[in-house]
């Protein structure tokens, strides 16, 4: 469902899903550390890493799961603080910092 919504948004705006997210959500909310690709995440200086136990004895870094082909279904990388901004918009019916930012 989210993938379909992303494709519809691309068709309506003439911009990629990634461009729409950055311009319409990240920028207005000041979500400067959030990104929408594994490449951006890997280039980040402050990203959490996942680890796994390999063959029951070796702890090793897990590769990031690349889901670019279905990005609108969950390819946003963010911090707790920045996701809290997004949640405030939803909780406050589109308002953020006492200003209307989004119409749902």
Predicted regions mapped to residue ranges:
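Short, surface-exposed loop or secondary-structure junction motifs
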Residues: 1-104
């Amino acid at each position: 469902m989210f993938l379909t919504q992303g494709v519809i948004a691309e068709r309506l705006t003439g911009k990629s899903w990634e461009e729409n997210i950055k311009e319409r959500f990240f920028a207005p909310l000041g979500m400067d550390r959030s990104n929408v690709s594994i490449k951006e995440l890997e280039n980040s200086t402050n990203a959490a890493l996942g680890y796994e136990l390999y063959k029951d004895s070796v702890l090793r870094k897990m590769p990031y799961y690349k889901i670019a082909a279905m990005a609108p279904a969950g390819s946003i990388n963010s911090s707790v603080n920045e996701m809290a901004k997004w949640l405030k918009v939803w909780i406050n019916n589109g308002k953020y910092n006492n200003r209307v930012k989004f119409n749902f």
